[in-house]
Amino acid sequence: MPMIETVNLTRKYGDLTALDNLNLTIEEGTCFGFIGPNGAGKTTTIKILATLLKPTWGEARVDGHVVGYQNHLIRPIIGYVPDFLGAYDDMLVSEYLEFFAACYGIHGEKRMRVVGEVLELTDLVSKRKSDVNGLSRGMQQRLSVARVLLHDPKVLLMDEPSSGLDPRARIEMRELLKELRRMGKTILISSHILFELAELCTAVGVVEQGKLIFSGGISEMMDRAGSGSMVHVVVDERPQEAAALLKQVRGILKVTLEREEKVVRIDVTIDPKSGMPISDIPSRLIAQGFRVARFSHEPMNLETAFMRLTKGIVS
């Protein structure tokens, strides 16, 4: 049984469709990256799974329990980390965690032990007596993670946990998430920092305009977006002739023309199995009398695949 599953999940806000028949499956123990532009429906999906929103229609399940009907069974097994920290004024870190531990029904010596364990896991022991509102953004995000770990949930729902963090805090958050993955947690994480997701996640989903346009492994996503690295070339004149010449070259999978401000850019996809050096592209054009004004190489990675998928190249 999947740990997270949505079936034709739809959410409307008046005339706006935030989620449009989203069908998503996440297996237990998966670290799943949720990728999409702003307004694509990522936060809405996470809030539904966190039982904070009801679907307009369709269904969402967490560990087999249906959102909206079995919320009392879902809430004890999830931890929701929004992109902000909600805290009361004049509260110490230890008081903050003890308060939420009590909300989860953790009392007495067990509560003190659990609070100590999550402080150690999130490297916040030295901040135990610090004021919550005086913490840095990175420390506050780690405190949010500590809060949701108090009751040892099966599922973590994380909405932009690295948003607004400085480089050091992002690295520390990434290492913490890796540790949670090693602990076997099922993690759904939305982020705009795609290279971090490539390091963390075993699978990704791409959502655009409320629709899921891809779900699967990272290597599968790259294959879907188009194998091979891409080379961008701009010639001074006759771009159509230059493109026609390149289409005849063995080892080139695809050649397209893209209008870019005042010039026409030639996009060339090279077959990774061909062994063709990328320098062959401008060399061949120059040998045929073309003047190359600009040349750049775009290796295939998660960011490149995302851009291709969400520009309508595949969807």
Predicted segments with their positions:
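Conserved ABC ATPase signature
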Residues: 131-138
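Catalytic Walker B motif of ABC-type/P-loop ATPase nucleotide-binding domains
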Residues: 156-159
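Conserved ABC transporter NBD signature motif
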Residues: 58-69, 73-74
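ABC transporter nucleotide-binding domain
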Residues: 174-270
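Conserved ABC ATPase "signature" region
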Residues: 98, 102, 109-127
